[in-house]
Amino acid sequence: MMKATLIAIASLLLAQNAGAPGWESQPSGTNIRFRGVSAVSRMVAWASGERGTYARTTDGGRTWTVGQVPGAAELDFRDVDAFDADTAYLLSIGEGEKSRIYKTTDGGASWQLQFKSSRPAAFFDAMAFWDRDHGIAMSDPVEGRFLVITTSDGGRTWRETPREGMPPALEGEGGFAASGTCITVEGRRNAWFGTGGTSGARVFRSTDGGRTWAVAATPVAHGKSAGIFSVAFRDARRGVAVGGDYTKESESKNNAAVTRDGGRTWISVGDARPNGYRSCVAYVRGAGDAMLVAVGPTGSDYSTDAGASWRSFGAEGFHTASFTRAGGGAAGWAAGERGRIAKYTGAARN
């Protein structure tokens, strides 16, 4: 009887561990800092980082090809959005002309400069795409309002959205270009971006492809180095924002909030918060899309209840993470310091 009980307990623990989230480290072949990652499928993913660097895998991460965009050695690519093994966009940050968007359609063999900011005061933080043709990118405030550009032709042209459609920024308000995920999109026209700074941490939302915006305050911590660093939405109503203070990596107070009404109102996560400052949050794109993963320099956390509570898994630090649907399961990667790349292990949960 005792033996049978022990076997049953062991089997249960094995089953639980088999579905538990985790990261499997993969050699990237570089020691640069990665800030962007984009999961395409179980086999294909892209990453981006400093010194004009990008990386790509087409074999599930067993090998990574690392390259440098010609003429971009001084640029820091904080965001990458990829659609397949051939097609990807890179966004670099910085004031004025350092803010750029490049595109490849041949797996990185060549890159086309699609956008270079002509505004000296602009500082682009991140971009997102609804589909292959329609995308959006946001900059810190220029003349008192956040600057947004959109494309409807696969990046061949990028146009500023109407200034009058953007609410005024608060004093000291800005975005955080930490992971390429302070802006996100959903459906065909919905978009959100998170902010921080000395006056508050807010989420801006648009339902018309970025032409007009509304804004809501959140309970996320704010300050000179604090605010919302990442937003993710499961659908048009349910979303999560994470952040904190990047100078206080272990501080978890007021580092996450959830919305159930499309970003009109935000509720602080209770005591079971992510375990420290978090630079990225993403839905694990498996069956049901009910699981979330958040990453930061002190480790990773997961939620199986739409962000209401969190559990830690692993102390290895990452800056960014990305997941995609693949054959009904979940495929994902995380990336960070010194060329660190890891593939997600574990089953998606409802």
Language-model segments: which ranges?
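Sec-dependent N-terminal signal peptides
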Residues: 4-13
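Residue-level hotspots at or immediately adjacent to binding/recognition sites across diverse folds
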Residues: 16-350
